[in-house]
């Protein structure tokens, strides 16, 4: 029995940046540092930051006056930003720059009075933050999750209409929704390239290749990680059993019955240390070889805020 590791896998530039912001803030200012929402959707990462003194909250009313707060990689609404400013909280923004790009698209649409349609998952913090950039009551922003949702849209005119997408969606599903939107609203405008981020795209492409050569695909990632869930779904759609696991403790040995090659990947918020712990555990269950799938190299780096960067250089 062998293991085939997907490439690329694991941390993306936005996740690296977000974790660095929390760690540097703790190093410079000391604990506690408050973080609004899980900075990234991975239990192992969050538990590690908690141990260093990060305090995770869901709303700013849980943050004491005058404290330091970090916004998660998923981004926040303008209302949250205004509340932080009103209360005089010291803010470090860990919003992924690729999410910020979508925020700017929404803000421009709001300012111009253009109706906006966001393709995304209802209730996901990125979606909540993105929709919260729109405040034009004379137009409006609407959420669709699927092709079926398009028929329910309360939008009759295609004039001054634009769309954008959550950054961690299924490429295939999103393409279907965009095609259906353009069919219903031929004049709808959108980004030249969809907003699904490079890391999501690369990891989904790697899973396609992984599934072709595996009888089981294990995706290392937490249950609340959107991009990790999409990886597991994609492998399943290709006819290969897939499991989303937080770590080796989640592996059921019965999954390995009749399996010759186990494909392993990791969501963009899952650290490589977890992947290696899964590999080592599988070796105790009969794995004898480990190889890497060829894939694209990622060199993207996002800088931390200047105040933290100066300290980092020192």
UniProtKB/Swiss-Prot annotation:
Belongs to the IspH family. The active site is at residue 126. Isopentenyl diphosphate binds at residues 41, 74, 124, 225-227, 269. The keyword Cell division does not apply. The gene is ispH. Keywords: 4Fe-4S, Iron, Iron-sulfur, Isoprene biosynthesis, Metal-binding, Oxidoreductase. Pathway: Isoprenoid biosynthesis; dimethylallyl diphosphate biosynthesis; dimethylallyl diphosphate from (2E)-4-hydroxy-3-methylbutenyl diphosphate: step 1/1; Isoprenoid biosynthesis; isopentenyl diphosphate biosynthesis via DXP pathway; isopentenyl diphosphate from 1-deoxy-D-xylulose 5-phosphate: step 6/6. (2E)-4-hydroxy-3-methylbut-2-enyl diphosphate binds at residues 41, 74, 124, 167, 225-227, 269. Its EC number is 1.17.7.4. This is 4-hydroxy-3-methylbut-2-enyl diphosphate reductase. It comes from the Bacteria. The lineage of its organism: Bacteria, Pseudomonadati, Pseudomonadota, Gammaproteobacteria, Pasteurellales. The keyword Metal-binding applies. It catalyses: isopentenyl diphosphate + 2 oxidized [2Fe-2S]-[ferredoxin] + H2O = (2E)-4-hydroxy-3-methylbut-2-enyl diphosphate + 2 reduced [2Fe-2S]-[ferredoxin] + 2 H(+); dimethylallyl diphosphate + 2 oxidized [2Fe-2S]-[ferredoxin] + H2O = (2E)-4-hydroxy-3-methylbut-2-enyl diphosphate + 2 reduced [2Fe-2S]-[ferredoxin] + 2 H(+). Signal peptide: none annotated. Dimethylallyl diphosphate binds at residues 41, 74, 124, 225-227, 269. [4Fe-4S] cluster binds at residues 12, 96, 197. Pfam families: LYTB. It is an enzyme of class 1 (oxidoreductase). GO terms for molecular function: 4 iron, 4 sulfur cluster binding; 4-hydroxy-3-methylbut-2-enyl diphosphate reductase activity; metal ion binding. Binds 1 [4Fe-4S] cluster per subunit. Its cofactor is [4Fe-4S] cluster.
């Amino acid at each position: 029995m062998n293991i085939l590791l997907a490439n690329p896998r694991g941390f993306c530039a936005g996740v690296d940046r977000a974790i660095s912001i929390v760690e540097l803030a703790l190093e410079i200012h000391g604990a506690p540092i408050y973080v609004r929402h899980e900075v990234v959707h991975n239990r192992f990462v969050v538990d590690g930051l908690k141990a260093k003194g990060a305090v995770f909250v869901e709303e700013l009313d849980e943050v004491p006056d005058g404290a330091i707060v970090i916004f998660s990689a998923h981004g926040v609404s303008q209302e949250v930003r205004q509340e932080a400013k009103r209360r005089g909280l010291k803010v470090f923004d860990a919003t992924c720059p690729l999410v910020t790009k979508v925020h700017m698209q929404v803000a421009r649409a709001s300012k111009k009075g253009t109706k906006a349609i966001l393709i995304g998952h209802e209730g996901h913090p990125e979606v909540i933050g993105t929709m919260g950039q729109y405040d034009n009551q004379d137009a409006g922003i609407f959420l669709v999750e699927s092709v079926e949702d398009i028929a329910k849209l309360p939008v009759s005119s295609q004039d001054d209409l634009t769309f954008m997408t959550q950054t961690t969606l299924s490429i295939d599903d999103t393409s279907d929704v965009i095609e259906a939107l353009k069919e219903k609203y031929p004049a709808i405008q959108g980004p030249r390239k969809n907003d699904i981020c490079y890391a999501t795209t690369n990891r989904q492409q790697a899973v396609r290749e992984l599934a072709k050569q595996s009888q089981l695909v294990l995706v290392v990632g937490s249950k609340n990680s959107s991009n990790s869930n999409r990886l597991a779904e994609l492998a399943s759609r290709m006819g290969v059993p897939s499991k989303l696991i937080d770590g080796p403790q989640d592996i059921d040995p019965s999954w390995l019955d009749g399996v010759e090659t186990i494909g392993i990947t990791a969501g963009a918020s899952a650290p490589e240390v977890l992947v290696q712990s899964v590999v080592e555990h599988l070796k105790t269950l009969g794995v004898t070889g480990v190889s890497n799938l060829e894939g694209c190299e990622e060199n993207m780096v996002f800088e931390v805020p200047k105040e933290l960067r100066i300290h980092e250089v020192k």
